[in-house]
């Protein structure tokens, strides 16, 4: 049995993107987030961006800042890390103690949806932003095509090559 989980469906869900999970499994993650999940795949939303590149970069920066705080809150302090790194993480965790994790996830989602997808010429996955490399023309996602991947056929965005090239370069 599979289940879709997302912040829009469950207030306790701790990520700014959805997942499809297998309810017959249990995923053990080394994190300060205590949310039960089965083995899962991520579902990343594609959100609109402003046409102006400087505004777009500023938009990415807001999301990246929140992502950094979110990651700081969920990372575990461990003896496998140096004392100095653990000390820096601990100070960061103390400084962000009063910021609820859910607030960060909701704020990321709110900011990501600021620009209407339908009215945007450029789009991106803002839930895990890689900055300007993620920015791509909306036409990349307007249709899908079937492609062969490791012996199986899958649907992919019609402009998958442009999208992957923007993110990874010569993939």
Where are these regions (language model features)?
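Conserved catalytic core of two-metal-ion nucleotidyltransferases
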Residues: 2-51, 56-60, 71-81, 85-169
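Mobile amphipathic helical/loop "lid" adjacent to a hydrophobic cofactor/ligand pocket
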Residues: 66-68
């Amino acid at each position: 049995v599979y289940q879709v989980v997302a912040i829009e469906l469950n207030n306790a869900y701790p990520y700014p993107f959805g997942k499809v999970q297998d309810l017959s499994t249990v995923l053990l993650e080394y994190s300060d987030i205590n949310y039960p999940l089965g083995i899962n795949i991520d579902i990343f939303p594609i959100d609109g961006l402003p046409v102006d590149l400087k505004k777009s970069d500023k938009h990415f920066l807001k999301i990246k800042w929140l992502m950094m705080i979110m990651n700081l809150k969920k990372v575990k302090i461990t003896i496998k890390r140096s004392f100095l790194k653990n000390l820096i993480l601990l100070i960061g965790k103390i400084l962000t103690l009063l910021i609820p994790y859910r607030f960060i996830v909701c704020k990321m989602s709110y900011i990501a949806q600021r620009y209407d997808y339908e009215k945007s010429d450029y789009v991106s996955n803002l839930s895990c932003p890689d900055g300007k490399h993620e920015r791509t023309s909306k036409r990349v996602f307007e249709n899908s095509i079937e492609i062969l991947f490791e012996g199986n056929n899958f649907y992919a965005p019609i402009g998958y090559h442009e999208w992957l090239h923007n993110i990874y370069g010569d993939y």
